[in-house]
């Protein structure tokens, strides 16, 4: 059923133990023939695939365990990737050599950059993706990743052993037990179970257990986690019905065409696989009062809407939109599901009405009068684990070497999942090789904001990335994700290829050189007016104007500037990307200077690490209120910076913690060179290097 | 004489009240007004750092009045940070810095107007050999409020300088390894006290007209920012209503006008209220106004035998036992009277409402925890018959006074002196001068940031201007988190798909 390929890296769905010798890689020759890996990743969704490949890129022998190999890379909900904020995450995943951006460049059918007119800091790279192509390309990539093994199987339980004394946590994970009773051992385990933990699908008043339509949920694993003492919450989400393409009257609807030229997601690609003229359009239609009427008249048939489980405020079902914003027309985007797909995805019509009512409602909508529903929309309710129970490296506080990534942590969206996947994969691998964790700070990337928000504040609704969550938005842009993360990913994590690293280094030095050259060119404003007549340079004084300041004007780009001052600027226009990035740097230059000051302040707090083994509830040397102790105990912040962001942790408590860190450092220094002190110092040193 | 307070509206029942009926309670509540609303540094950190206001990083240069407040011959103002030297040169109009660690006499003048401020001793401590490890300057100026206020405002006008956050000097010193652990021990307590005091100060300050204004402005700005953010995060795919940006633009411009007018006005109009704050409160006809008149030695309040004569909060600056004090007379606390008096009662409660909870929770056991203190005074002691029984023995510690005969006044003044010494000597209470400098700094900062709001160009830049502006306002009003923004977005718009 699955074929083997390439030097035994790919183990086909192993249903029997007899097939395990293929992957027996245990270094202990005396050990029985039980498979042993460095890292096991459970789940083959967007977090799982990124986690598995990231761990493998870092050099770990990795096993990806999934219910069904043919659903690896499945896009279970919308047929699109990216968007505002989410596109930022994808650029960062790509900067760490993750997969999703590259796969999207090979699988899209409609590429469009959102927010084009609102400034490059908030551009949102987005594309409609061919589901089938994405899955194919993803599976090809996964199967060709060195050190990565894929196996089918449902995990029922975790194998736990005594904890390592030098780390916190009440036990340590050392493998998994599958449903068939077989065991696989590993140094680290990553759970990326998405909505499968006690997943429940809801249509109308019907509910049945499932992680995704047609897939079994994970119940044993959910029980294991609860027994271990993890705090579990419940969330809900939904997906719209799918409509037959040939039953829609597109001719009366607004058409949206893709960008020309298409902008690729990945730093390594200059173009995407498909020409703009071959791409598919999207169409826009609106709901109307008849839709509202059907929703309101049938609330009694809709248990998902009535339930109290928290759903997202921002990805609401049509039912909650009608309830919260009555008497309005709501947008419905009709999106292609793929090149040769007969389905259309009505974005904006997520619903859980009984199936027959879904069709009735849809046929009320303009253009959909004769629409046929091929698959009904449905709601999903699932368990998530309070993300305050994990560290910024995504390892759990409770169980050593157990990592969580993706929807299990209360997020929503492919991109949010992928971002966590990369970080979990890297850290699971670093943990095996006993290296310090790879943590992205809020000051370094959207990934950092996402994980810091989750681990310090938790979440009560599915967490989605917005640019408004990011305080250093002008510094953390889609264009400079490589400068921010690729270099660190190469040096600190080892997850980045040599080629990508060298490209990022070249880009960084070229940008720095370009900016300093642009700063050094100074002319009077009248001379600039002669050189570039189309721009009206406003100067109140007769001070000389730098080329960098001229480049700030909307009408000016590197090309026009290089035409005016060919030497030495001409060479910076040869690389399109470099020229565009210099323009962006110029646009934000003045603000970035101030933001850098602020970033330094935050990083100072981030550099002050709190010892991991503090027992906040009993510790005596620190005077802290009971409330503060409980909060610190639950979230276990790793740095003073993170502690100070927890609501309710007072400034006085922070100062007390500072004092405690200092005392601990001194004590440890006295005890002759402790690794923790070293680490604190190293981190402080690294700060200097990390400045943009 | 610090007492566990009774709720003013609910005086303790006296056993022999029949005999000493005229004996009435007066409570004198002491607190410092207008002291720093400096929000503790952590309270900013606790919010998501969307403020955009200057962070306590190595970048910013901070200044503060570091000598105690009250009357003093010399006041010391300190700066710390990379722009310290620059600030010193600007204020002394000198090209060179004075020799390091030597006291030099210099004429300080306001860099904006050139107006001389004071002849002062200045000391230049280049880092790292300084208190904080950074470049520091000390200005030893003559201690009058006008001079101190002038120098603080002059410093605030130097680019790159801002008023220090609570404990920020110490924190910097700590970060740079300049403090030993015993020195830091006290810091936490200090910051705790500051936080507590500031919470009340902020409440009190923000009760007034200015607070009302600030909160209104912050609300407007938060909403405008939320709408711009919604336009950035959702505008493309979702159908936001028409004119969201235009509306935000109109509101921001109106805010700019209001802020500008206020700032021009504030320089002349804002009365500098220095000193400790003493509120006289109690039931009607207890003789509160008589006591105020007695203490201020002038007829501040109208007195009459009729209960409810005082219907508003009357404030008068007085010199009490050598301390500058703002004395407030309040309406008697009672229910069921006319609307005007009810308003007076409401204001009276408000003027000490931030005390009520503290009084109830702090009590006599841990008075040091709070800068808020209470004296229980029983007036009309002249009506006690000398041979009759005294006030009930189970009353909390109290003072007897007769405003009519003046008997007991010396005892009261002595008790007040002790309290005031404790309050004014408390390092946790900041200077009102700094409060004002701080207000002006942030309002000006807000106004400056708003001038960079140009939504027609790069919207991310425009939003950044609003974020910085909002950061300045929320430093004064509190709040300022990202969640507030998201709440408004999801309340006002149907976004998401």
UniProtKB/Swiss-Prot annotation, chain A:
This is 5-taurinomethyluridine-[tRNA] synthase subunit MTO1, mitochondrial. Residues 1-25 form a transit peptide. Residues 683-692 have a biased composition (Basic and acidic residues). Residues 669-692 are annotated as: Disordered. Its main location: mitochondrion. FAD binds at residues 43-48, 155, 218, 407. GO terms for biological process: mitochondrial tRNA wobble uridine modification; tRNA methylation. HAMAP family: MnmG_GidA (MF_00129). Its cofactor is FAD. The lineage of its organism: Eukaryota, Metazoa, Chordata, Craniata, Vertebrata. Keywords: FAD, Flavoprotein, Methylation, Mitochondrion, Transit peptide, tRNA processing. One of its GO terms (molecular function) is tRNA 5-taurinomethyluridine synthase activity. Belongs to the MnmG family. PANTHER family: GLUCOSE INHIBITED DIVISION PROTEIN A, PROTEIN MTO1 HOMOLOG, MITOCHONDRIAL. The modification N6-methyllysine is found at residue 508. InterPro entries: FAD/NAD-bd_sf, GIDA_C_N, MnmG, MnmG-rel, MnmG-rel_CS, MnmG_C, MnmG_C_subdom, MnmG_C_subdom_sf. Component of the GTPBP3-MTO1 complex that catalyzes the 5-taurinomethyluridine (taum(5)U) modification at the 34th wobble position (U34) of mitochondrial tRNAs (mt-tRNAs), which plays a role in mt-tRNA decoding and mitochondrial translation. Taum(5)U formation on mammalian mt-tRNA requires the presence of both GTPBP3-mediated GTPase activity and MTO1 catalytic activity. It comes from the Eukaryota. The gene is MTO1. Homodimer; forms a dimer in the presence of potassium. Interacts with GTPBP3; forms the GTPBP3-MTO1 complex composed of homodimers of GTPBP3 and MTO1. It catalyses: 5,10-methylenetetrahydrofolate + uridine(34) in tRNA + taurine + GTP + A + H2O = 5-taurinomethyluridine(34) in tRNA + 7,8-dihydrofolate + GDP + AH2 + phosphate + H(+). Pfam families: GIDA, GIDA_C_1st, SAM_GIDA_C. It is found in: Mitochondrion. One of its GO terms (cellular component) is mitochondrion.
């Amino acid at each position: 059923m699955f074929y083997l390929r390439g030097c035994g890296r790919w183990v086909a769905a192993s249903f029997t133990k007899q097939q395990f010798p293929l992957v027996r890689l245990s270094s202990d020759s005396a050990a029985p023939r039980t498979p042993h890996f460095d890292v096991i990743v459970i789940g083959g969704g967007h977090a799982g695939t990124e986690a598995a490949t990231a761990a493998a890129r870092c050099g770990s022998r990795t096993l990806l365990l999934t219910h069904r190999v043919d659903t690896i890379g499945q896009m279970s909900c919308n047929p699109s990737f990216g968007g505002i904020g989410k596109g930022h995450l994808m650029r960062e995943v790509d900067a760490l050599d993750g997969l999703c951006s590259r796969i999207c460049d090979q699988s899209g059918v409609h590429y469009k950059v959102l927010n084009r007119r609102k400034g490059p800091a908030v551009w949102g790279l987005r594309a409609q993706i061919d589901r089938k192509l994405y899955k194919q390309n993803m599976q090809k990539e996964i199967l060709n990743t060195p050190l990565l093994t894929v196996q089918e199987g449902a995990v029922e339980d975790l194998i736990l052993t005594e904890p390592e004394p030098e780390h916190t946590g009440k036990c340590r994970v050392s493998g998994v037990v599958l449903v068939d009773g077989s065991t696989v051992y590993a140094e680290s385990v990553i759970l990326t179970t998405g909505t499968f933990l006690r997943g429940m699908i809801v249509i109308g008043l019907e509910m049945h257990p499932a992680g995704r339509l047609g897939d079994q949920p994970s119940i044993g694993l959910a029980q294991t986690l609860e027994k271990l003492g993890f705090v579990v919450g419940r969330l809900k989400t939904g997906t719209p019905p799918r409509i037959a393409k040939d039953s829609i009257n597109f001719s009366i609807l607004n058409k949206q065409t893709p960008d020309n030229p298409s902008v690729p997601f990945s730093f390594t690609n200059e173009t995407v696989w498909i020409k703009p003229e071959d791409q598919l359009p999207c169409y826009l239609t609106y709901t109307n009062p008849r839709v509202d009427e059907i929703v309101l008249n049938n609330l009694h048939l809709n248990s998902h809407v009535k339930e109290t489980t928290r759903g997202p405020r921002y990805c609401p079902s049509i039912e909650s939109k009608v309830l919260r914003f009555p008497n309005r027309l709501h947008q419905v985007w009709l999106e292609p599901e793929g090149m040769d797909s007969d389905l259309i995805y009505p974005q904006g019509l997520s619903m859980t009405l009984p199936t027959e009512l879904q069709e009735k409602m849809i046929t009320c909508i303009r253009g959909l009068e004769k629409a046929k529903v091929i698959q009904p929309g449905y709601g999903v309710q699932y368990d998530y684990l309070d993300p305050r129970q994990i560290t910024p490296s995504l390892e759990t506080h409770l169980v050593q070497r157990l990592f969580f990534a993706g929807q299990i942590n209360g997020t929503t969206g492919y991109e949010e999942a992928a971002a966590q996947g990369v970080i979990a994969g890297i850290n699971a691998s670093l943990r095996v090789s006993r290296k310090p964790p790879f943590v992205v700070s809020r000051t370094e990337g959207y990934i950092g904001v996402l994980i810091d928000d989750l681990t310090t504040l938790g979440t009560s609704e599915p967490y989605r990335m917005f640019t408004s969550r990011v305080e250093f938005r002008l510094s953390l842009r889609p264009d400079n994700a490589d400068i921010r993360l690729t270099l660190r990913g190469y040096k600190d994590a080892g997850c980045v290829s040599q080629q990508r690293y060298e490209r990022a280094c070249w880009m960084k030095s070229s940008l720095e050189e370009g900016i300093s050259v642009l700063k050094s060119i100074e002319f009077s404003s009248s001379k600039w007016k002669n050189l570039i007549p189309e721009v009206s340079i406003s100067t109140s004084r007769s001070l000389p104007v730098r080329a960098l300041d001229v480049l700030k004007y909307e009408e000016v780009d590197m090309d026009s500037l290089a035409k005016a001052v060919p030497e030495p600027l001409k060479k910076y226009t040869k690389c399109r990307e470099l020229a565009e990035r210099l323009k962006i740097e110029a646009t934000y230059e003045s603000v970035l200077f101030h933001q850098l000051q602020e970033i330094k302040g935050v990083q100072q707090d981030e550099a002050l690490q709190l010892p991991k083994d503090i027992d906040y509830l009993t510790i005596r040397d620190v005077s802290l209120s009971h409330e503060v102790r409980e909060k610190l105990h639950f979230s276990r912040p790793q740095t003073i910076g993170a502690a100070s962001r927890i609501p309710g942790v007072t400034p006085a408590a922070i100062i007390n913690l500072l004092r405690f860190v200092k005392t601990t450092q001194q004590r440890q220094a006295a005890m002759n060179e402790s690794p923790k002190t070293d680490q604190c110092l190293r981190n402080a040193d690294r700060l200097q290097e990390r400045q943009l | 004489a610090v007492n566990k307070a009774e709720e003013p509206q609910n005086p303790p029942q006296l056993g022999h009240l029949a005999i000493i009926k005229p004996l009435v309670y007066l409570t004198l509540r002491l607190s410092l007004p207008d002291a720093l609303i400096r929000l503790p540094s952590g309270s900013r950190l606790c919010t998501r750092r969307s403020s955009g206001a200057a962070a306590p990083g190595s970048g910013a240069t901070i200044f503060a009045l570091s000598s105690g407040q009250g009357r003093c011959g010399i006041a010391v103002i300190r700066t710390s940070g990379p722009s310290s030297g620059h600030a010193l040169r600007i204020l002394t109009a000198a090209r060179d810095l004075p020799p390091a660690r030597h006291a030099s006499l210099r004429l300080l003048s306001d860099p904006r107007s050139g107006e001389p401020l004071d002849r002062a001793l200045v000391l230049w401590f280049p880092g790292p050999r300084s208190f904080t490890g950074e470049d520091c300057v000390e200005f030893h100026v003559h201690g009058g409020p006008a001079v101190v206020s002038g120098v603080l405002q002059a410093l605030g006008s130097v680019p790159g300088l801002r008023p220090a956050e609570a404990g920020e000097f110490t924190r910097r010193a700590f970060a740079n390894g300049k403090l030993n652990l015993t020195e830091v021990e006290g810091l936490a307590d200090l910051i705790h006290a500051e936080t507590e005091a500031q919470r009340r100060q902020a409440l009190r300050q923000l009760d007034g007209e200015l607070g009302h204004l600030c909160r209104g402005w912050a609300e407007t700005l938060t909403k405008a920012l939320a709408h711009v953010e919604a336009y950035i995060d959702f505008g493309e795919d979702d159908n936001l209503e028409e004119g969201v940006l235009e509306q935000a633009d109109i509101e921001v411009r109106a805010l700019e006008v209001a802020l500008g007018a206020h700032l021009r006005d504030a320089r002349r109009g804002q009365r500098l209220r220095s000193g400790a704050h003493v509120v006289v409160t109690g039931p009607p006809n207890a003789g509160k106004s008589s006591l105020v008149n007695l203490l201020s030695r002038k007829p501040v309040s109208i007195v009459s035998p009729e209960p409810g004569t005082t219907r508003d909060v009357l404030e008068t600056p007085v010199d009490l036992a050598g301390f500058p004090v703002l004395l407030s007379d309040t309406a008697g606390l009672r229910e069921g009277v006319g609307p005007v008096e009810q308003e007076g009662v409401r204001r009276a409660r408000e003027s000490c409402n931030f005390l009520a909870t503290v009084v109830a929770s702090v009590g006599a056991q841990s008075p040091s925890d709070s800068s808020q203190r209470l004296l229980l005074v029983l007036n009309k002691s002249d009506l006690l018959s000398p041979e009759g029984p005294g006030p009930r023995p189970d009353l909390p510690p109290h003072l007897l006074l007769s405003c009519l005969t003046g008997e007991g006044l010396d005892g009261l003044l002595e008790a007040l002196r002790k309290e005031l010494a404790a309050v004014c000597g408390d390092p946790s209470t900041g200077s009102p001068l700094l409060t004002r400098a701080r207000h002006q700094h942030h309002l000006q900062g807000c106004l400056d940031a708003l001038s960079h709001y140009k939504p027609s160009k790069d919207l991310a830049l425009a939003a950044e201007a609003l974020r910085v502006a909002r950061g300045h306002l929320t430093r004064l009003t509190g709040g300022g988190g990202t969640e507030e923004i998201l709440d408004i977005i999801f309340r006002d718009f149907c976004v998401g798909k």
